[in-house]
């Protein structure tokens, strides 16, 4: 590891993650024209954001930076894979890792893995259906579309807010911060689907000011304590989302992790670590029994 990388990793442990993220979140919601127009223009230029696919192409039309960052796309900008039974990629970005969940652990990077149960908030019962299953981790870069969509149609069963740190998420931290995704703040969404249980985990990172879902709105930051929301109780109307429907969004970005049970899906042979992906592309197909 280079000296520069060592310095970066050391800074990750010393910086006040949540304070920085809250301050940046405040700036991202600022509506002052002189400020938000300059910030949006700089960001779009710095990260070469393609506005031609956005519903609103005019950078100055966004009321604040977060509205720009979570911008909607034009109809048809992300066609859904048409293969029978296709499991869709949930977000734009790049595959960080994908593969089997082995011995209750998920591969993070060379020399590092993390606990499935810890990812889901330390609940062994929640983790049980995914033991021996499969996972895919999608990293959303700053230039990407930052809404997360359903890989399969599903009925929401449970949502868990898991407090944690806000380490930056990139290749350097993945290779050098142990249990990165099981340490960062995250929102776990559990669904019942035609392929059995499915989890979509929205993982925060440094400067991720908040995570939203379409059914609950703003999920973070509440009080920093684990909180479970159940949606399969008789008193609640079922929440069902169709394949490709929006699930949630990052106000400033990070990572989406999708989990499936054993013998349910076979990942697209063309995908591997660092493969670029777009929401709606075929991530996997049903595994033949």
Curated annotation (Swiss-Prot):
Modification note: Is synthesized initially as an inactive proenzyme. Formation of the active enzyme involves a self-maturation process in which the active site pyruvoyl group is generated from an internal serine residue via an autocatalytic post-translational modification. Two non-identical subunits are generated from the proenzyme in this reaction, and the pyruvate is formed at the N-terminus of the alpha chain, which is derived from the carboxyl end of the proenzyme.
Family stated for the protein in its record: Belongs to the phosphatidylserine decarboxylase family. PSD-B subfamily. Prokaryotic type I sub-subfamily.
Protein known as: Phosphatidylserine decarboxylase proenzyme
Site residues (Cleavage (non-hydrolytic)), renumbered to this chain: 253-254
Entries under InterPro entries matching the protein: PS_Dcarbxylase, PSD-B, PSD_type1_pro
HAMAP family cross-referenced by the UniProt entry: PS_decarb_PSD_B_type1 (MF_00662)
Record localization: Cell membrane
Gene giving rise to this polypeptide: psd
PANTHER family the UniProt entry points to: PHOSPHATIDYLSERINE DECARBOXYLASE (PTHR10067), PHOSPHATIDYLSERINE DECARBOXYLASE PROENZYME, MITOCHONDRIAL (PTHR10067:SF6)
SUBUNIT field: Heterodimer of a large membrane-associated beta subunit and a small pyruvoyl-containing alpha subunit.
E.C. number: 4.1.1.65
Keywords carried by this UniProt record: Cell membrane, Decarboxylase, Lipid biosynthesis, Lipid metabolism, Lyase, Membrane, Phospholipid biosynthesis, Phospholipid metabolism, Pyruvate, Zymogen
Biochemical pathway: Phospholipid metabolism; phosphatidylethanolamine biosynthesis; phosphatidylethanolamine from CDP-diacylglycerol: step 2/2
GO CC term (a single one): plasma membrane
Modified residues annotated as Pyruvic acid (Ser) in this record: 254
CC cofactor: pyruvate
Protein source organism: Pseudomonas aeruginosa (strain LESB58)
BP GO annotations: phosphatidylethanolamine biosynthetic process
Role: Catalyzes the formation of phosphatidylethanolamine (PtdEtn) from phosphatidylserine (PtdSer).
Cofactor binding remark: Binds 1 pyruvoyl group covalently per subunit.
Pfam families in alphabetical order: PS_Dcarbxylase
Enzyme class name: lyase
Catalytic activity: a 1,2-diacyl-sn-glycero-3-phospho-L-serine + H(+) = a 1,2-diacyl-sn-glycero-3-phosphoethanolamine + CO2
Catalytic residues identified in the record: 92, 149, 254
């Amino acid at each position: 590891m280079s000296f520069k990388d060592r310095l970066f990793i050391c800074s990750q442990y010393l910086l006040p993650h949540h304070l920085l993220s809250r301050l940046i979140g405040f700036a991202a919601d600022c509506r002052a024209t002189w400020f938000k127009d300059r910030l949006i223009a700089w960001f779009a230029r710095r990260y070469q954001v393609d506005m031609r696919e956005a519903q609103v192409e005019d950078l100055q039309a966004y009321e604040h930076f977060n509205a720009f960052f979570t911008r909607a796309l034009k109809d048809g900008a992300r066609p859904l894979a048409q293969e029978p039974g296709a499991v869709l990629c949930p977000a734009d970005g790049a595959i960080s890792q994908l593969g089997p969940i082995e011995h209750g652990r998920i591969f993070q990077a060379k020399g590092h893995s993390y606990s499935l149960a810890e990812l889901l908030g330390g609940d062994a019962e929640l983790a049980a259906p995914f033991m021996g299953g499969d996972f895919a981790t999608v990293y959303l870069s700053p230039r990407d579309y930052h809404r997360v969509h359903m890989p399969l149609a599903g009925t929401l069963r449970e949502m868990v807010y898991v407090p944690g740190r806000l380490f930056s998420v990139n290749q350097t931290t993945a290779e050098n911060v142990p249990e990165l995704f099981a340490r960062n703040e995250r929102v776990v969404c559990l669904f019942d689907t035609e392929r059995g249980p499915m989890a979509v985990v929205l993982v925060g990172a440094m400067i991720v000011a908040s995570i939203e879902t379409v059914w609950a709105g703003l999920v973070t930051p509440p009080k920093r304590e684990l909180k479970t929301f159940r949606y399969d109780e008789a008193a609640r109307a079922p929440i069902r989302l169709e394949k490709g429907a929006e699930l949630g969004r990052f106000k400033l970005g990070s990572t989406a992790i999708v989990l499936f049970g054993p013998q349910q899906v076979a990942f697209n042979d063309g995908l591997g670590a660092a493969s670029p992906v777009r929401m709606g592309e075929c991530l996997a197909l049903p595994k033949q029994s």
